[in-house]
Each structure stands twice: as C-alpha cells, then as structure tokens.
UniProtKB/Swiss-Prot annotation:
It comes from Corynebacterium glutamicum (strain ATCC 13032 / DSM 20300 / JCM 1318 / BCRC 11384 / CCUG 27702 / LMG 3730 / NBRC 12168 / NCIMB 10025 / NRRL B-2784 / 534). The gene is hemE. SUPFAM superfamilies: UROD/MetE-like (SSF51726). It is an enzyme of class 4 (lyase). Pathway: Porphyrin-containing compound metabolism; protoporphyrin-IX biosynthesis; coproporphyrinogen-III from 5-aminolevulinate: step 4/4. This is Uroporphyrinogen decarboxylase.
C-alpha cells in the first residue's frame, strides 16, 4: 500500500455530524449512533432474519444491507454501522466457526499450539459479499449519514480462537500469553493481515469510518495489554490510517486501559459507561493528547423512562463539554457504553436519539 490511499469508491459527505465530529470540527447537531443498533431490538430485524443463521446473513448482500439500514430509517441516527460480526473475517478466511444461539462464536478447532497457529488460514483478499452489501447501503444513505465499518481487534479474536468460544475468565488465553509467549505473539501477528484485509475490503467498497472493537480487552491488566496486545492493534490502525478516514477504538470494561489503548492510534476513543467522560478524557489526554470521545450511556438506561433518560443524556453531554473546555478532548460522538440490549423497546431508542439531538 502507498503512504496515503484514497479509494475511488469514497463518496463526498456534506454536513455529516459523525464525520465532522470525528475530524474535530463542530457538527450541525450532537452526532449519535448506537452499537448494536441493527439487531434484535427491532421487530423488522427479527422478521427478515427469520430462519437464517447469523453468520449466513452477514454474507448475503441484500439482507446485510437491509439490516444495516433499518435503524437509520427508524431512529434517525447519524450513522449506519455495517451489519456483521467480529468473526466474519475468520469465516471468510476459511476458519471453521459458527455463532451458536445463546452462546456466541464457537470454533470447530481451537488454536492451542504453534502448529495450530501456522495452520490458521489468513484472509488474503477482499470479501465480495460484504462489498456488494456496502454498495447497496451507500445507494440509500444521504450524504450526511455516515457508514461505519468495523472489525474485531486481534486480542478478542485470539481469545475466541484459543478458548474455542466465549469465556468468562479467559484462562486458556492468559495461560498461552504468559506460559507460551512465542506462540501467543505468533497468533497475534497471524491475525493482523486478516483483520487489515477485512477492513481494507470495507474501505475499498466506500465506508466512511472504521471502528476496532476489543470486546474482551477489559479482562487484561495494563501491563499485559501493553506487552501482548498493543503492538498488534497499533499495526492495524496504522494500516487503516493510510486511507485517511476516521478511526474509532473501543473496548468493554477498559476504563483503566484508556491511556494504553489511546497509544494504538485513533482519532476517536470509545468509552464504556463505567467511567465519566471527563475523567476518561483526562486519562487519554495525559498519554496521547486530546482525542474525540465516543460514548457513554449505560444501555440499561434505555429502560428507565424519559425523565431519568433525559437527565443521564444531559449529564453525559455536559461531561463531554467539560472535557472539551478543559482541552482534554476535541469533540464528542454520543453512543452507548456498550451495545443495545436485545429486549430494548425500539420506540425508546428513537426517543433517546430525539433527546440527544434536541
């Protein structure tokens, strides 16, 4: 790849609040999108997904486009987030993986040895089904509505591979990390091109921003994150940075890791609900200088009713403004501190967006 690459498919956005905020500009309104906004909270999602597995739906262009667009139509959010799953790049590379209802991604064969790492397939090219879906999405979005692509960060993917599926304690992952560090580093290095090529495929198709999700990073100490994870997330974000589009970095339960994660290189840092935004901004700015903040409403507050919800939204917006005024942040994108909970009432999400925009 050249030093700077602007894909031919890249469209020109006009007064797009998400992109303006991510670039440190003043948006026309408080920008908002929600993680997992496309999903089980929407009755229309349940209808179109009926009888189709999660992973299969991620490789069906018309269906993934429809699901991506549903919350934009319903809620008036400022961005669509590509409907996908963090294990899609693994499946596209040829790894045996399924998403089991009520459990999550389950691997046919866990990765436990150096030989397993060497046999792990690498995604070499693009993912045409996803690219076709992105084309359909972009045809419907206005020039003020962004499309955010995403990928799972290497630590989270590595943990799924080593554990063989979801884990409460990540004991096999940490055992490899400390007991067989050579194999651990080999696994992380092998995942990097698969993640980069997945994001490159989305970028080539025309997405407007990317988010790197590190769902399980919050289980790590700062020392372990810095030694065993940071170099690989940094490499991925550096590669994406060559395409000159906003990069968002988010992990769950990572309040104590915000400074370390900010070193990986992104314009936007996602913050979960456990840390006030102004405090999060201080931690980030102390290490990497001021960045744009994203977050951080507790998803459970969408069940609380209009008055307490409004109070929380106003508090979060005030904390973000405090961070900006103090020089610790350069902007704010409103989001949840994690994903929309499956049993959230769709109308309550729409109401939250309206309150945020007001």
């Amino acid at each position: 790849m050249s030093a700077l690459t602007i894909p031919a498919a890249r469209r020109t956005l006009n007064n797009a609040p998400i992109i303006d905020a991510a670039n440190g500009k003043t948006p026309t309104r408080t920008p908002v999108w929600f993680m997992r906004q496309a999903g089980r909270s929407l009755p229309e999602y349940k209808k179109v997904r009926e009888g189709i597995s999660m992973l299969d739906s991620c490789f069906m262009p018309e269906l993934l486009a429809e699901i991506t667009l549903q919350p934009v139509r319903r809620h008036d959010v400022d961005a669509a987030i590509l409907f996908s799953d963090i294990v899609v790049p693994l499946r596209a590379a040829g790894v045996g993986v399924e998403i089991v209802a009520g459990r999550g991604p389950v691997l046919d064969a866990p990765v436990r040895s150096r030989g397993d790492v060497l046999n792990l397939p690498i995604l070499e090219g693009n993912v045409p089904e996803v690219e076709q879906g992105i084309g359909i999405i972009l045809d419907e979005l206005s020039d003020s509505q962004a499309l955010i692509g995403f990928a799972g960060a290497p630590f989270t993917l590595a943990s799924y591979l080593v554990e063989g599926g979801p884990s409460k304690n990540h004991e096999k992952t940490k055992a490899m990390m400390h007991g067989d560090p050579e194999t651990w580093h080999a696994l992380m290095a092998r995942l990097v091109p698969t993640i980069v090529n997945s994001l490159k495929s989305q970028i080539d198709a025309g997405i407007d921003a990317v988010q790197l999700f590190d769902s399980w990073a919050g289980f790590l100490t700062e020392r372990d994150y810095t030694e065993f994870v940071l170099p690989y997330s940094t490499e991925i974000l550096e590669e994406v940075g060559k395409y000159q589009l906003p990069r968002i970095h988010f992990g769950v339960g990572t309040g104590e890791l915000l400074g370390a994660m900010s070193k990986a290189g992104s314009e936007v840092m996602g913050v979960d609900w456990r840390v006030p935004l102004d405090k999060a901004a201080e931690r980030i700015a102390a290490v990497s200088g001021p960045k744009v903040l994203q977050g951080n409403l507790d998803p459970a507050l969408l069940f609380a009713g209009r008055a307490p919800l409004t109070k929380e939204i106003e508090r979060i917006k005030a904390e973000a403004q405090t961070a900006v005024d103090a020089g610790h942040a350069t902007g704010h994108i409103f989001n949840l501190g994690h994903g929309v909970l499956p049993n959230t009432v769709a109308e309550d999400i729409t109401e939250a967006v309206s309150i945020i925009h007001s």
